[in-house]
């Protein structure tokens, strides 16, 4: 068996989050279906964390095991992304990892970004990607938030 780490980008707006759930579509479920189809074997994918509904990812790490050695990584990524094209999910990179690698337990750090847009007008471009606060936020509160996050 070979272990591969992938980096993924996705929007969770129309999903229940990362983790597979009965009767609801998740990022994990879509990736497992597409990878299983591409590799012609049942694939289980493990994420470095589990994002909730409404939480997007720009470089989520995950891993899967397969019987196949993936020689041409660019062709593999392109073919998987072709099948992912109807979803807001994309594989950014893939790396072969040693036996024992685990996306969650081998992670050294995690980075989170929180976007707050403070204005009266409704959000259009950033809708579902930021927390919209219509009331004016004071400067002291803003500085305090920067240091805590």
Regions found by a protein language model. Give the residues of each.
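Structured-RNA-binding interfaces characteristic of tRNA pseudouridine synthases
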Residues: 1-148
């Amino acid at each position: 068996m070979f272990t591969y780490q992938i980096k993924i980008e996705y929007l969770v707006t129309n999903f229940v989050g990362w983790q597979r759930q009965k009767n609801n579509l998740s990022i994990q479920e879509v990736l497992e279906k597409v990878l299983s189809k591409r590799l012609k074997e049942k694939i289980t994918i493990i994420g470095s964390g589990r994002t909730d509904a409404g939480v997007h990812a720009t470089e989520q790490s995950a891993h899967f095991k397969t019987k196949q050695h993936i020689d041409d990584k660019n062709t593999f990524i392109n073919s998987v992304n072709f099948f992912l094209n109807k979803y807001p999910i994309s594989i950014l990179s893939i790396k072969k990892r040693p036996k024992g690698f685990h996306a969650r337990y081998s992670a050294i750090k995690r980075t989170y970004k929180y976007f707050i847009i403070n204005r009266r007008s409704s959000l259009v471009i950033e809708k579902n990607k930021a927390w919209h606060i219509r009331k004016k936020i004071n400067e002291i509160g803003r500085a305090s938030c920067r240091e805590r996050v």
